[in-house]
Amino acid sequence: MITKEEVKKIAKLARLKFEEDKVEEFSSRLSSIMDMIDILNEIDCTDVKPLTSVCDMQARMRPDEVTSKDHSNELFDNVQGASQQLAKEVKYFITPKVVE
């Protein structure tokens, strides 16, 4: 059984806020989830092969094709405002400073 104090601790760690009257509800819900997990942990899976996918389909991938075209101008067309031309000249994105 997950206690009200444990629910409050989990909520604090997850930075969740909810009404005090919901603590009892979350306590019973989390306890039932933990009970289901305990049941699953009791199942013997030693001879079961791991499942990697529920469907046996391969992803269709296009072949890689090497091209000599320079796509940088198309890429830098996405830059907004006056810094677009400068970005095309120096070949990198100019962003606001985010670290002191």
UniProtKB/Swiss-Prot annotation:
Give me the segments passing through the membrane.
none
Enzyme class, UniProt record, top EC level:
ligase
Gene3D superfamilies hit by this protein: Glu-tRNAGln amidotransferase C subunit, N-terminal domain
Q: Which UniProt keywords apply?
A: ATP-binding, Ligase, Nucleotide-binding, Protein biosynthesis
Extract one GO BP annotation from the record: regulation of translational fidelity
Q: Give the enzyme's EC designation.
A: 6.3.5.-
The terms under GO molecular function for this entry are: asparaginyl-tRNA synthase (glutamine-hydrolyzing) activity; ATP binding; glutaminyl-tRNA synthase (glutamine-hydrolyzing) activity
Catalytic activity from the UniProt record: L-glutamyl-tRNA(Gln) + L-glutamine + ATP + H2O = L-glutaminyl-tRNA(Gln) + L-glutamate + ADP + phosphate + H(+); L-aspartyl-tRNA(Asn) + L-glutamine + ATP + H2O = L-asparaginyl-tRNA(Asn) + L-glutamate + ADP + phosphate + 2 H(+)
**Assembly behavior:** Heterotrimer of A, B and C subunits.
Question: What biological function has been recorded for the protein in this entry?
Answer: Allows the formation of correctly charged Asn-tRNA(Asn) or Gln-tRNA(Gln) through the transamidation of misacylated Asp-tRNA(Asn) or Glu-tRNA(Gln) in organisms which lack either or both of asparaginyl-tRNA or glutaminyl-tRNA synthetases. The reaction takes place in the presence of glutamine and ATP through an activated phospho-Asp-tRNA(Asn) or phospho-Glu-tRNA(Gln).
Which NCBIfam families does the record associate with it? gatC
Q: Which HAMAP family match?
A: GatC
In the record, the note on similarity to other proteins reads: Belongs to the GatC family.
Q: What is the name of the protein in this document? A: Aspartyl/glutamyl-tRNA(Asn/Gln) amidotransferase subunit C
Species per Swiss-Prot/TrEMBL record: Rickettsia bellii (strain RML369-C)
Q: What is the lineage of its organism?
A: Bacteria, Pseudomonadati, Pseudomonadota, Alphaproteobacteria, Rickettsiales
